[in-house]
Amino acid sequence: MTPYFMEYYGNPSGHYEYGETSKKAIEQVRRTIADSLGAQPEEIYFTAGGTESDNWALHGMADFHPGGHIITTQIEHHAILHTCEYLEKKGMRVTYLPVDEKGMISLDQLEDAICEETCMISVMFANNEIGTIQPIDDIGKIATKYNICFHTDAVQAYMHLRINVHDMAISMLSASAHKFGGPKGVGFLYIRKDQPIRAFMHGGSQERHMRSGTENVPGIAGMGKAVELGMKHGKEEAAYVKKLRNDT
């Protein structure tokens, strides 16, 4: 990160040497993240972290489907729950699925909750309090069956569990760098290229006009390095954490 604080302090949108260096750096990170997910670089949008990514996913779909129906769970992160509560005040209808004693949702209850107005399913990949890993593959199949957008808050899962957005039929995915060894204040939202959604911030042309504002180049560079290390050492780290769990 240090070179982008000290030496290459250029605006990625600028048409000068330092700006072009910054632009190349963030585009390389975009490609690295895309490769880690089985996605395309143009499907990765940089944000200020998981909370912003979750808000964008929910608000973006609500703006595109006013008065629509969202399905989520009772044990989501507050970035999802509080946003859903806000959207209910704006006319959206939200179903909060219960969970069992292990924190798992029922796939039957999920499918039963789907109606004609359902525009989005948002289920956390791995819970931030109790560690429950939801059946993401099966949820993706249900979402595909009914042609519904499937968003997952993968803040606790990305770089710790295998994720392939294509194989899992994930439409949108939120991640935050500091959950996998990167800096705070930066993250990303994966948006499948055929997924209609409104822009989150308006202004300049950054992030393909979807999330305007000068990019956090040092933060993005740090996140990219954390992804590289995670891809290289992820299996070793997972085995170590599993051993810690089993030995306690």
Tell where the protein language model's regions lie, with residue ranges.
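Pyridoxal 5′-phosphate
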Residues: 1-248
